[in-house]
């Protein structure tokens, strides 16, 4: 306490001295050097203020994308004319985007701003910064970032036992990288269904059967138009590759959904397939406790567990509850963009919150994760609604972020190439274009390090057979983090 009082006394003397000095000094005009910062004409547009207040939380600063998609690139799902953009702003799209009660003049200003951002982006590539050529130094490891290949709107990758990599492109193609080179021809014959309006997203995640070396099964999640109305149908399919062709195609599961970006898959040691299906609930009109993510009869906002052929296991937690979907393993999830097992067989999930509240969770059988009633973020509506961060009977995250980095996929590192990374969890970020290394002890975070920042929106993360960490970005880069 004495030190604190002495500090205040010293501060008081300093303030007095400054005041006295100012009193004895003649007043004079301050001459400042002219600013060298060029004004940004786009940021000065009337629509910029409206966008920053109402839209940037989802779509990122200058519309480059965060949790929501970029509005400054060539991928337009709901049309690219001024009328299309205005219609989307005014009417929204259930359940992903709220309708906004703007005046016609405000909508005109917003459309003009989005148009200006798009034109500016054509001149300067905002999406992919230069891959660093120098060695990256982190707390316990040094590495170089190498570009393996480039793609168009990729989503996920997996390595085959022979070292080749399969990469999905959301427009509906499956590509092959062999010995560090992208093969010119895509895999043919994958039934991708009716193309979504605009380029959209069709083929998403990919996984190999645990006995792939014997049976050759490859699993995909595919988004298709919903013939019954708005939204999509999400499918889990499997097939085999013979030569350069997709064969033996089977549909194992399908469900209507409003989310076309959150279907991740992972197999456990027993050969069960786990799949995530999101529910953002941005504009869900009913009471939060009645949201689809908390409704056991609805697949959205869930982690699902199935046999390798799509059947529901008899020991799933809700198989004996009338009306419940027998595939449900856990519920109350928002946007699950990553799923992975650690070396002990524990299932982990990375999840986008709304305004804040991004999470990494341990997924437990039959557990409730709370969304949208319980979250460390804020719900999106015309105005944000605050939910409770904790509630009895609801699981708490192991890691939580605020503000939100828009976390994406994740992977555990178990190789010896970077020995001091062993057992660490790597999580990608779309908003900050980062890669996080998380050190865990007894299933609790003890350290978090940002090992890479600013290259591009990280969409997928994995570890290759060579022990290197691989990243796939929205800008089309397939990157390798190799020892320096």
What kind of feature is each model-predicted range?
Residues 233-243, 291-308, 363-364:
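Beta-propeller blade signature
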Residues 107, 114-282, 338-340, 346-353, ...:
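Acidic, Gly/Ser/Thr-rich repeat motifs that build Ca2+-stabilized beta-propeller blades
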Residues 184-199, 249-262, 299, 308-329, ...:
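Surface-exposed loop and turn segments in beta-propeller and other repeat-based domains
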Residues 40-61, 83-91, 148, 152:
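Sequence/structural segment immediately N-terminal to covalent heme-attachment motifs in c-type
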Residues 26, 33, 37, 41, ...:
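Extracytoplasmic electron-transfer domains, predominantly the class I c-type cytochrome c fold
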Residues 23-50, 325:
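Electrostatic cytochrome c docking/interface patches
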Residues 43, 51-57, 62, 67, ...:
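Short pre-active-site segment immediately N-terminal to redox-active cysteine/selenocysteine motifs
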Residues 333, 444-465:
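Conserved blade-ending motifs and adjacent loop-strand segments that build the rim/top face
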């Amino acid at each position: 306490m004495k030190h604190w009082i002495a500090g205040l006394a010293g501060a008081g003397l300093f303030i007095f001295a400054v005041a006295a000095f100012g009193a004895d000094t003649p007043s004079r005009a301050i001459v400042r050097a002219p600013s060298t910062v060029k004004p940004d004409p786009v940021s000065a547009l009337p629509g910029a203020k409206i966008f920053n207040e109402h839209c940037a939380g989802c779509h990122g600063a200058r519309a480059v994308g965060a949790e929501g998609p970029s509005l400054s690139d060539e991928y337009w799902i709901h049309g690219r004319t001024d009328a299309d953009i205005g219609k989307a702003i005014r009417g929204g799209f259930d359940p992903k985007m709220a309708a906004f009660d703007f005046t016609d003049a405000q909508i005109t200003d917003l459309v003009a701003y989005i148009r200006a951002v798009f034109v500016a982006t054509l001149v300067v590539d905002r999406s992919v910064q230069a891959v660093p050529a120098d060695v990256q130094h982190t707390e316990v490891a040094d590495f170089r970032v190498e570009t393996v290949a480039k793609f168009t709107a990729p989503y996920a990758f997996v390595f085959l036992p022979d070292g080749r990599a399969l990469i999905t492109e959301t427009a509906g193609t499956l590509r092959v990288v062999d010995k560090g080179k992208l093969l010119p021809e895509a895999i043919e014959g994958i039934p991708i269904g009716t193309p979504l309006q605009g380029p959209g997203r069709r083929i998403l995640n990919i996984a190999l059967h645990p006995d792939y070396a014997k049976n050759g099964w490859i699993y995909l999640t595919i988004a298709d138009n919903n013939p019954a109305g708005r939204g999509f149908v999400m499918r889990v399919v499997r097939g085999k590759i013979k030569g350069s062709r997709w064969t033996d195609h089977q549909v194992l599961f399908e469900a209507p959904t409003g989310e076309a970006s959150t279907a991740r898959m992972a197999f456990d040691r027993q050969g069960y397939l786990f799949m995530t299906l999101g529910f953002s609930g941005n504009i869900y009109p009913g009471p939060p406790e009645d949201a689809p993510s908390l409704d056991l009869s609805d697949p959205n906002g869930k982690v699902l567990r199935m046999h390798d052929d799509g059947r529901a296991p008899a020991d799933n937690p809700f198989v004996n509850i009338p009306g419940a979907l027998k595939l449900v393993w856990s519920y109350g999830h928002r946007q699950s963009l990553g799923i992975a097992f650690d070396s002990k067989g524990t299932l982990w999930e990375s999840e986008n919150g709304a305004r804040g509240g991004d999470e990494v969770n341990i997924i437990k059988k039959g557990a409730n994760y709370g969304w949208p009633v319980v979250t460390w973020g804020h719900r999106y509506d015309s105005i944000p609604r605050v939910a409770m961060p904790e509630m009895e009977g609801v699981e708490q995250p192991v890691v939580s972020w605020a503000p939100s980095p828009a976390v994406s996929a994740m992977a555990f590192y178990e190789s010896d190439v970077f020995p001091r990374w062993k057992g660490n969890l790597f999580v990608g970020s779309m908003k900050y274009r980062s890669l996080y290394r998380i050190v865990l002890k007894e299933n609790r975070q003890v350290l978090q390090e940002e090992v890479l920042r600013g290259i591009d929106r990280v969409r997928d993360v994995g570890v290759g057979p060579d022990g290197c960490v691989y990243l796939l970005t929205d800008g089309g880069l397939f990157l390798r983090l190799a020892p320096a």
